[in-house]
Amino acid sequence: LDIEYFFTDTGEELDEVYEYLNMLEGYLGKPINYLDPKRDFKFWMTQYNNFLPSAQARWCTVRLKLTPFEKWVDEEFLQKGIKVKSYVAIRSDESFREGLQSKKEIETVLPFKENHIDKQAVFEILENSGLGLPKYYEWRSRSGCTFCFFQRKIEWVGLMERHPEAFENAKRMEKTALDNGSPFTWCQSESLVELSKPE
């Protein structure tokens, strides 16, 4: 297979993500294309009336992940008549996930789902390859940008302890959102200010 690897960089990733991508490039022996959305998270937040993204309004995924990917595929492949298959790492134990659909010219393939590979099997593949798991799995259950709204509360506590500057940045964004009438906080039912108060 002629595979091009890519990473859609939101500009709000944990340092551990970049460390792992560097290791992965060495393992693959091929560069990973970093796709830049051109406009950062804060720009798009202002475009969405300073509302935070949520499970119901995932503008961050569309603007910072899907749109740059589609642009790259269109310019590098589709306009040149090259057919594209996009391999998406949704696992077999994630039956609730379908992934955001991109352009109809891009065929989406879900190899983990198709081959019944669950989270434990993915971890085993990574361990057996010698790569191991990304360091953020020491305290997080999933990948995603620094302040992904899918994080559990304990993961926000982990962010506060391990990356206090990123946690403070997320608090500032949340305050901006709340000051502008956003119905969402990063965590369901409690703000990061409340979460960070000692008990």
Placement of each model-derived feature along the sequence:
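Nucleotide-activated chemistry modules centered on ATP-dependent adenylation/adenylyltransferase
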Residues: 1-199
